[in-house]
Structures are given as C-alpha cells and as structure tokens.
C-alpha cells in the first residue's frame, strides 16, 4: 500500500499534498492549509518505483503479504513549514474541511532490506527547481486526478 506520493514525475500530480502546497507556494506565494494537524504518510515517486521493483524482484521472499510503502508521517502543517523555509510564502490556515489523518508503518518492508533514498525535503527542492525553469507551469486537468476523471466521465 503506497503512501501519498510526492516529487517530480513525467505526469506531475498537483492534487497531492507536497506537490500542491509547493506549487501554491511558488506561484501564488501562499500555502493553503486546511487545519494542519492531519497526518499524511509520504513517499517520493522514485522510492515508490524502487519499492515496486524490489518487491517484484524478491517476490518469493514476500509470499503475497501486504506491505506498506511510506516513510515520512508528517502533519500537513509540518509540510507547509518545510516549504515555507524554502520559499517566501504565507501560510493561510483555513477551517479543517478534510479531517482524514493516517499513518503508515513500513517497518516490515524496511526489515526486508529495502531502504528509501528520497525525502519530502528532496521532493520540495526538486519541485522548486523544476518550477524555476518554467515561467508558468501550464497544468491541465491531467495534473488533477479527480478533474481528469470527471473530464473522462469516470465514476
């Protein structure tokens, strides 16, 4: 079970916590936080790909068990502060509309020998560097899964 994915990818998702907050900070100079005390587990896209590769390559070792793949359980406010430390942006706290909060324990996967290499801080840095190379990142509904599903009339 993967955590909330973050980081730069060929199809950049801007509806995921770290990516969205970094995008808003960079382009809008505001980080919009609903509540902030909710916890989200995170995984960099490169680590997710490595974990899938690792699980497939060592499939006999895992015997069809379920493994969590997420390594940084952070409050939304912690993520916002990490971003604010890198971008001059104001944190705007709104009433908490999304009260979901969850953690992941990936110790079983770590005990098997898998080691993540990328952090939320790394994801923030690479997103900032990517946005710096673009005068205005031209996002479309393809960058937001729910909007894309509506566009394709998928329920």
Explain the meaning of each model-derived region.
Residues 21:
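Anionic-ligand binding region
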Residues 28-29, 33-155:
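C-terminal substrate-binding subdomain of Rossmann-fold SDR/epimerase-dehydratase oxidoreductases
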